[in-house]
C-alpha cells in the first residue's frame, strides 16, 4: 500500500510530520505501507515552477492514497492564476477523478465549550456530509462574462447527469448504512430543474438500500436546520455548490476547523485526504499549529482506502484520550487546560496509541 505524502505549504510540513509519525508507528507494528513524499502547491512552484509537477502527477497515479497537508500562501497571489498553489489541488483532484468529498463533523465532548452554539444543542454532534465534487455550476458549460445589449452579463450553468448523481448517491447510502442508517438529500427542487433530477435519481437509488431511511430537504431549510437542530442529521448528501457552503457552515459547529479531516474519493475508494483548514502562513514555523485534523485525516485514509478499521479507530480513540487528558494546542485552548505545541501534541497522541 503506497501512500503519497504531500506536505504542501505554510503549516503543512509541521502537521504532516506528526501524521507521518502516526503512520510510521503502524508501519512498525507490521502494517504494509510505503510512504513517499512529493511536492504540491507553493513548494512545487518554488522548486519546479508548476503547482502540480509531472513527478507529483506520476506519484499520485501510482499511489493507493494521498495525504495532504495544506497549500497556499500570500506570496503567490501575484502569480498568474494557473500558476497559483491552489491550482495544484484542483489539478490533482481532476487527474484522479475524485468525485466524492466526505466531511465528518464531530464535536468531541471535551471541546463542547468551543462551539458558538449552546452545549445542549451540539452535544454528541456527529454528521457526515457527502458532497459531489466534479459537477454542478462550478464546472458546467457554457460559462463566462460577455457583453449583451451594451452591458456586461455573467453566466454559469448548473448541470448534472443521472450517472453523476447516482454514483454520489451510492457513496452516501453506503456511508449511511455503516453509520445510523439515515440519509438526508439536500436540493432546491422547487425552483431548479437540475435539482429536481437530483431528487428523482436519489429517490430511485434508495430502492437498493432498504435499510437506510431517506429524507429530502431544501437547501435553505437545511442551512437553517444545521444551526437550529444539527443533531437531527446523520449523513447529508448534496451537490457541489450546496455542499461547499453547507460543509463550511457545519464545520463551525465544532468550534475549531483545526479538528476536522476530509476525504475526496474516486469510484474505487482511492482518495486524497486532508484537513479542512488552510495553510495558515501567519503561524507557520512557530510550532503551534494543531496537527489533529491531519492525524484524523490519516485515520480516514486507513478506513476508506485501506479498509483498516481497527487502526483508524485506534487513532481516533488516541486523539480523544489526548483531549480527555486536557492537552490543547493554542486554537482550542481554554483556561485550565495544558497548552502544547505541534510536536508535543503528536507526542501525546503517539503515547496514547502505544498505551492501548
Curated annotation (Swiss-Prot):
Pathway: Amino-acid biosynthesis; L-leucine biosynthesis; L-leucine from 3-methyl-2-oxobutanoate: step 3/4. It is found in: Cytoplasm. Its EC number is 1.1.1.85. NAD(+) binds at residues 73-86, 278-290. GO terms for cellular component: cytosol. One of its GO terms (molecular function) is magnesium ion binding. One of its GO terms (biological process) is L-leucine biosynthetic process. PROSITE patterns: IDH_IMDH. The record marks 138, 188 as: Important for catalysis. SMART domains: Iso_dh (SM01329). SUPFAM superfamilies: Isocitrate/Isopropylmalate dehydrogenase-like (SSF53659). InterPro entries: IsoCit/isopropylmalate_DH_CS (IPR019818), IsoPropMal-DH-like_dom (IPR024084), Isopropylmalate_DH (IPR004429). It is an enzyme of class 1 (oxidoreductase). Substrate binds at residues 93, 103, 131, 220. It catalyses: (2R,3S)-3-isopropylmalate + NAD(+) = 4-methyl-2-oxopentanoate + CO2 + NADH. Keywords: Amino-acid biosynthesis, Branched-chain amino acid biosynthesis, Cytoplasm, Leucine biosynthesis, Magnesium, Manganese, Metal-binding, NAD, Oxidoreductase. Mg(2+) binds at residues 220, 244, 248. Its main location: cytoplasm. Pfam families: Iso_dh (PF00180). PANTHER family: 3-ISOPROPYLMALATE DEHYDROGENASE (PTHR42979:SF1). Homodimer. Catalyzes the oxidation of 3-carboxy-2-hydroxy-4-methylpentanoate (3-isopropylmalate) to 3-carboxy-4-methyl-2-oxopentanoate. The product decarboxylates to 4-methyl-2 oxopentanoate. This is 3-isopropylmalate dehydrogenase. It comes from Nitrosomonas europaea (strain ATCC 19718 / CIP 103999 / KCTC 2705 / NBRC 14298). The gene is leuB.
Amino acid at each position: 500500500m503506497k501512500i503519497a505524502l504531500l506536505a504542501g505549504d505554510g503549516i503543512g510540513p509541521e502537521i504532516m510530520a506528526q501524521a507521518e509519525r502516526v503512520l510510521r508507528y503502524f508501519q512498525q507494528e507490521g502494517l504494509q505501507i510505503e510512504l513517499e513524499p512529493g511536492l504540491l502547491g507553493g513548494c512545487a512552484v518554488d522548486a519546479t515552477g508548476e503547482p502540480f509537477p509531472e513527478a507529483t502527477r506520476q506519484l499520485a497515479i501510482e499511489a493507493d492514497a494521498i495525504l495532504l497537508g495544506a497549500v497556499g500562501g500570500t506570496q503567490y497571489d501575484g502569480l498568474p492564476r494557473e500558476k497559483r498553489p491552489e491550482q495544484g489541488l484542483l489539478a490533482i483532484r481532476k487527474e484522479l477523478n475524485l468525485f466524492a468529498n466526505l466531511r465528518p463533523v464531530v464535536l468531541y465532548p471535551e471541546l463542547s465549550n468551543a462551539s458558538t452554539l449552546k452545549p445542549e444543542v451540539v452535544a454528541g454532534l456527529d454528521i457526515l456530509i457527502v458532497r459531489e465534487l466534479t459537477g454542478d455550476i462550478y464546472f458546467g458549460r457554457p460559462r463566462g462574462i460577455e457583453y449583451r445589449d451594451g452591458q456586461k452579463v455573467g453566466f454559469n450553468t448548473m448541470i448534472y447527469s443521472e450517472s453523476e448523481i447516482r454514483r454520489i448517491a451510492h457513496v452516501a447510502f453506503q456511508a449511511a448504512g455503516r453509520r445510523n442508517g439515515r440519509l438526508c438529500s439536500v436540493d432546491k427542487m422547487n425552483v431548479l430543474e437540475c435539482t429536481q433530477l437530483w431528487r428523482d435519481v436519489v429517490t430511485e437509488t434508495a430502492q437498493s438500500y432498504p435499510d437506510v431511511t431517506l429524507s429530502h430537504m431544501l437547501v435553505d431549510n437545511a442551512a437553517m436546520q444545521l444551526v437550529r437542530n444539527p443533531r437531527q442529521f446523520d449523513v447529508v448528501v448534496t451537490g457541489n455548490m450546496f455542499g461547499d457552503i453547507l460543509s463550511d457552515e457545519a464545520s463551525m459547529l465544532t468550534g475549531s476547523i483545526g479538528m476536522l479531516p476530509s476525504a475526496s474519493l474516486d469510484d474505487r475508494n482511492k482518495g486524497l485526504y486532508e484537513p479542512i483548514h488552510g495553510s495558515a502562513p501567519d503561524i507557520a514555523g512557530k510550532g503551534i499549529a494543531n496537527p489533529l485534523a491531519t492525524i484524523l485525516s490519516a485515520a480516514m485514509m486507513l478506513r476508506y482506502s485501506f479498509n483498516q478499521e481497527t487502526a483508524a479507530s485506534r487513532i481516533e480513540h488516541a486523539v480523544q484520550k489526548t483531549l480527555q487528558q486536557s492537552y490543547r494546542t493554542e486554537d482550542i485552548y481554554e483556561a485550565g487546560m495544558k497548552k502544547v505545541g505541534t510536536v508535543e501534541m503528536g507526542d501525546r497522541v503517539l503515547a496514547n496509541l502505544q498505551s492501548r
